[in-house]
Amino acid sequence: MPKRVLQGVVVSDKNDKTVVLKVERRYSHPLLQKTVRQSKKYKAHDENNQFKVGDFVSIQESAPISKDKRWVVLTSEAAG
């Protein structure tokens, strides 16, 4: 089974070798008939501490690295 890849914005880089990302998904609500935005935060492994707050990055699923980290930062995307 392929590993999931998500895109999000770095909201915290205060931890060593860890960044916190906010991943937003949009979907159409069946009853309200409007587009709803829902976000979730993920902790991802950043080996070289190279990503800063505000960066738009891609993360990939991995084996558990710690209690909360199960994602690895792949690349930085162009913001836009």
Curated annotation (Swiss-Prot):
Any single Pfam family the record assigns to this protein: Ribosomal_S17
Gene Ontology molecular function, alphabetical: rRNA binding; structural constituent of ribosome
One GO BP annotation of this record: translation
Keywords attached to this entry: Ribonucleoprotein, Ribosomal protein, RNA-binding, rRNA-binding
Annotated Gene3D superfamilies: Nucleic acid-binding proteins (2.40.50.140)
Spans traversing the lipid bilayer: none
Superkingdom per UniProt: Bacteria
Family recorded in the similarity comment: Belongs to the universal ribosomal protein uS17 family.
Protein purpose: One of the primary rRNA binding proteins, it binds specifically to the 5'-end of 16S ribosomal RNA.
Subunit structure, interactors included: Part of the 30S ribosomal subunit.
Protein name: Small ribosomal subunit protein uS17
Species this protein is from: Brucella suis (strain ATCC 23445 / NCTC 10510)
Gene name linked to the record: rpsQ
